Amino acid sequence: MNVKELRNQDVSTLNETLIKLLKKHFELRMQHKSAQLDDASKLGKTKRSIAQVKTIIRQKQV
């Protein structure tokens, strides 16, 4: 998801997106531990997306 698109969303939608990303990150970590993950860069990309969403949520709260 694009940062511009994230900035246009309200906080409740961002929280839902954050929950989805956290679940996805957990699943990717489990796949990585069991050697089923083909592309390990997905972990980093998901982690970065989580950080972006958290940052935007915090900016909207202030």
Swiss-Prot record:
GO terms for molecular function: structural constituent of ribosome. It comes from the Bacteria. Keywords: Ribonucleoprotein, Ribosomal protein. One of its GO terms (biological process) is translation. Coiled coil: none annotated. InterPro entries: Ribosomal_uL29, Ribosomal_uL29_sf. GO terms for cellular component: ribonucleoprotein complex; ribosome. The keyword GTP-binding does not apply. NCBIfam families: L29. Belongs to the universal ribosomal protein uL29 family. This is Large ribosomal subunit protein uL29. The lineage of its organism: Bacteria, Pseudomonadati, Pseudomonadota, Gammaproteobacteria, Candidatus Pseudothioglobaceae. The gene is rpmC.
